[in-house]
């Protein structure tokens, strides 16, 4: 979540435009996030499902003017998914407690048809629009390099990281 928030903030001159709320934050940090939300400074909030299921947070979220709910990594909802997390299956219940009238978007890059169906059912989505695209996207570059030995591999990784500062690469 932190890296997503950092990316959003990099496009804006205000650090409080986006926040995350999860168990890694201490009480003081949580208070700052909640204060920014209450004053309307924060426009985008990332919340871990485990955090969203806490009653105190549900009551807090009810006080906010929420535009919509976005469920990222939605495949985690499905018991058929590769990353199943039980708290994800309670998201619809939590969203209904907060504001059942708000729209929901569910996002994933790894849902089989069975997982897609489970997501739709579990989130109670009615006539959802489903968009599917290829993994092979023109903005991605693929390269496979042989692993000669550990020392050479480590040097190659270090060289790659140094040559591509502030960029992605696996």
Model-identified regions with their sequence ranges:
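Conserved nucleotide-binding/hydrolysis micro-motifs of P-loop NTPases
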Residues: 1-3, 25-27, 51-53, 75-76, ...
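Conserved strand-helix element at the start of the C-terminal RecA-like helicase core
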Residues: 1-4, 163-170
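Conserved nucleic-acid-binding Ia/Ib motif block in the N-terminal RecA-like helicase ATPase lobe
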Residues: 2-47, 130-131
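Conserved catalytic network of the ASCE P-loop NTPase/AAA+ motor domain
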Residues: 10-13, 35-40, 59-64, 95-102, ...
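Conserved helix/coil segment N-terminal to the catalytic DExD/H
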Residues: 25-68, 76-82
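Conserved RecA-like ASCE P-loop NTPase motor core of nucleic-acid helicases/translocases
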Residues: 46, 104, 168-170
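Post-DEXD/H (motif II) to motif III coupling segment of the RecA-like Helicase ATP-binding lobe
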Residues: 62-63, 67-132, 151-154
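Inter-lobe coupling/hinge region of RecA-like P-loop helicase motors
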Residues: 137-145, 166-170
């Amino acid at each position: 979540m932190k890296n997503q928030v950092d990316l959003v903030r990099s496009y804006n001159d205000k650090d409080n435009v986006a926040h995350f709320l999860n168990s890694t934050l201490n009480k003081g940090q949580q208070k700052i996030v909640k204060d920014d939300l209450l004053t309307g400074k924060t426009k985008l909030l990332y919340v871990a499902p485990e955090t969203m299921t806490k009653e105190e947070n549900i009551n807090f979220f009810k006080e906010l003017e929420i535009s919509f709910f976005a469920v990222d990594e939605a495949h985690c909802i499905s018991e058929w998914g590769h990353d199943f997390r039980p708290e994800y299956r309670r998201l619809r219940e939590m969203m209904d407690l907060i504001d059942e009238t708000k729209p929901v978007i569910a996002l994933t890059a790894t849902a089989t048809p069975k997982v897609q169906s489970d997501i739709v059912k579990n989130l109670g989505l009615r006539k959802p629009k489903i968009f599917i695209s290829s993994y092979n996207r023109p903005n991605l570059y693929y390269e496979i390099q042989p692993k000669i030995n550990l020392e050479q591999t480590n040097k190659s990784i270090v060289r790659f990281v140094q040559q591509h500062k502030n960029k992605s690469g696996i």
